[in-house]
Amino acid sequence: MKSTGGNEVQKAGKSQVKVGRQNKTIITNTMYTMGGMLLMNGVLQLVIYPLLNRQMGAEQLGNLLYIMGLVSILCPSVGQSLNTSRLVVRRDYPVTNGDYDWTILIFGVVGSAAALGCSGKELHTPSAYLATFLLLMITIFRYYGDVEYRLNLNYKRYFIYYLMISLGYLGGFFLYRASGSWFLIFLVGESLALLYVGISGTVFRGFFSRSASFSVVIHRGLFLTLSYLITNTTLNMDRLVLNRLMGNVAVTEYYVVSLIGKTMVLLIAPVNTIVISYLTKRRETLTKKQFLKGVAAGLGVSALFFLFCEIATPIFIRLFYGNLYESVKGLIMVTNLTQILGLLSAFLFILVLTFTDERWQLWLQAAHFVLLLVLAAAGTKAFGILGFAWASLAANCLRVGAVILLGVAKARKG
């Protein structure tokens, strides 16, 4: 009996050590992922874009932001969705690198052609069209490329991946100063990351080898890509609607006032990657109780992020875009709240994705997109940029409520 009791204590001790190590690993991985995103976005938002604002002015920067808006819509929609899809599908199908590499290539070419068609009057020369096409394709593969480190839970290399992008942006800026082409900033950054994953990883090896699961990858990936496409179009709705209805200066103004909030949204993305990486390794799905705990945690973190944004946004605008502060100060609170609710819904969607069919996410995203488009167009026409801000807030409130209801309805009992 004593021996049995001793064994039980020993097993309990080993179990606690194992849990402690796992928690430490999760914290370390979170630091690496958030550190990588902070570094990349810090270089962009604190160095590259403020310097471009001084070089170009609000009108030309608005043109650049519109083109980069197309990049921000298409590239994560294809690259990140297939990245996430691979983590989920691997549990049920023996997929290969080539299955996903081919899918990215097909979706990327079709999507890039569509994005060029949406560029309208913002691209003026054949070289600008070519540079935009190259930027779209390279960035799509870059968004997918970090799946190498998510599959293996190697978040130290994930950090280095984003370090390469940051260094590339800085190097590309010097090439921009010499050539006058801002495309070089982003082409160099994205290409350097792909070079790193090509050297350190295997995710692009066996590019042309497809398995019997290829059709599954196409089918599952298409639904998730469409869902991400709707989400990212929604996130960049300001650039599309304001560009069409008010012009490039309004695009720059809303970009500046929403920047801190959008950076918070970007920061939650790597946390989401860790969440889905660990949850998809489990055989059992979340219970209603576990999902609601996730909702509560998301609400708490979102409240803290909102307070931070309210303090940081005015300081940031005065420091880096002082010439625009007076024209945007009335937008700060409503815009920050809009972005933080977007952050919360993105986190909740990741939780829901682990125990529901991808089509549910697609339908909810589509409904939110249509609602936002209608409200934003009407609000902007009636009240200008302030009308757009309030319309966006209303749509995001409804989105958060809808995804919580879906999670409660679909999570297993317990």
For each feature predicted by the language model, list its residue ranges.
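Transmembrane helical elements of multi-pass membrane transporters/channels
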Residues: N29-N41, Q45, M164-I165, W182-V197, ...
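Membrane-water interface segments that mark the loop-to-transmembrane alpha-helix transition
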Residues: T28-N41, Y66-L123, E284-F308
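Helix-loop junctions and terminal segments of transmembrane helices
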Residues: Q45, Y49, C75-P94, K262-T285, ...
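Hydrophobic alpha-helical transmembrane segments
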Residues: F159-G206, L371, I385-A409
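Membrane-interface junctions at transmembrane-helix termini in multi-pass inner-membrane proteins
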Residues: S85-Y93, T139-I160, L337-L364
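N-terminal membrane topogenesis motif
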Residues: M1-V43, S200, F208-L224, V403-G414
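Interfacial segments at transmembrane-helix termini and the short loops linking adjacent helices
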Residues: A58-L61, S119-L135, I311-L343, L386
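Signature of the first transmembrane helix
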Residues: K2-G5, Q22-S77, L222-V249, L372-A377, ...
